[in-house]
């Protein structure tokens, strides 16, 4: 990455007035025969030179990861190396997408998972409802493909979503009866991190209900305490959430990692027989992956749907 955020372009005329040199309080700018130059070792990226230039020859050069972070968790150290502050990071994953060099990546547990399988332990995959939109193959065939990777069982997290719906509905009704002005859902780990780290005043309005991943993992562990639970998740946030529940959620893999496993093992999803869906899962449980899915599920099961008036936050911005 660039060491400083401001550069002099070829629009510079090496003018006589040289306002940029006077604006810089660190003496970082020198003017040659054709244009000015900024010394990256002296520059503190204050931007005063850019503001002073009448030709707009000095521009701001953004660092993609820093610019993409919505909470200012990424910055350079004294050596110019980027670092992510875990006290600020909400694990939204925007920096990973923004970095053109692929320098930011998630911690992977794939080797750990296969070690558990090799040791003969019952490794159970917990699949998020959004997986259905990630592959061209039928959703049931994708579930079969996951089983062929060596998992002892494949459980839909939509099962836990039903429990989340019931508990969140009851909590919402109780809060409204007590006079609360509103309540937010609690399933998105990045939202929860944002509240805890940057908006603590909002925490009183957030539902205390666990996410579907937690309830699904609890159910698996209750049936078989020896089971190793692996969440197949759509986002970086789920990995951070799993760290809060290490006793029931053992590992997390992303959809990208799942696709890599299919390719590495040469599993042709289209050629597989589709796995049957769990008949105990209500339709609204699979709708959690959609925008306002949690709220719509609560609304659909509420005694009086008109009590639920949703306000939707769509997207990371």
Regions flagged by a language model, labelled:
Residues 39-40, 45, 55, 64-124, ...:
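Conserved Radical SAM active-site core
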Residues 25, 70, 100, 196, ...:
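A short local structural element in Rossmann-fold oxidoreductases
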Residues 106-317:
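Iron-sulfur-associated redox domains of electron-transfer enzymes in respiratory
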Residues 2, 6, 14, 18, ...:
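Short, amphipathic alpha-helical segments
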Residues 1-52, 56-59, 63-66, 316-317:
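Ferredoxin-type iron-sulfur electron-transfer modules and their immediate structural context
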Residues 14, 18-23, 52, 98, ...:
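Transmembrane alpha-helical segments of multi-pass membrane transport proteins and ion-pumping complexes
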């Amino acid at each position: 990455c660039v060491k400083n955020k401001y550069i002099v372009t070829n629009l510079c005329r090496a003018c006589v007035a040289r306002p940029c040199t006077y604006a810089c309080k660190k003496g970082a700018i020198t003017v040659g025969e054709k244009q000015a130059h900024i010394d990256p070792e002296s520059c503190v990226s204050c931007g005063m030179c850019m503001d002073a230039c009448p030709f707009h020859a000095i521009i701001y050069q953004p660092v993609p990861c820093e610019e993409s972070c919505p909470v200012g968790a990424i910055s350079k150290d004294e050596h110019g190396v980027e670092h992510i502050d875990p006290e600020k990071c909400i694990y939204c994953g925007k920096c990973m997408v923004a970095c053109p060099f692929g320098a930011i990546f998630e911690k992977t547990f794939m080797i750990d998972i296969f070690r558990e399988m090799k040791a003969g332990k019952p490794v159970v995959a917990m699949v998020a409802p959004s997986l259905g939109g990630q592959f061209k193959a039928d959703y049931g065939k994708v579930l079969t493909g996951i089983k062929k990777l060596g998992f002892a069982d494949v459980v839909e997290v939509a099962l836990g979503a039903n429990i989340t719906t019931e508990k969140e509905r009851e909590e919402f009704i109780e809060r409204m009866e007590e006079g609360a002005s509103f309540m937010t859902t609690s399933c998105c780990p990045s939202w929860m991190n944002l509240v805890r780290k940057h908006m603590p005043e909002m925490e009183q309005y957030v539902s205390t209900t666990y996410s579907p991943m937690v309830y699904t993992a609890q159910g698996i562990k209750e049936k078989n305490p020896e089971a190793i639970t692996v969440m197949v998740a759509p986002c970086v946030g789920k990995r951070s959430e799993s760290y809060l529940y290490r006793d029931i959620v053992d590992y997390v893999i992303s959809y990208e990692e799942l696709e890599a496993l299919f390719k590495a093992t040469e599993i042709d999803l289209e050629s597989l027989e589709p796995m049957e869906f769990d008949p105990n899962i209500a339709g609204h449980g699979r709708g959690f992956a959609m925008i306002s899915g949690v709220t719509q599920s609560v609304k659909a099961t509420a005694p009086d749907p008109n009590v639920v008036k949703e306000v939707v936050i769509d997207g990371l911005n």
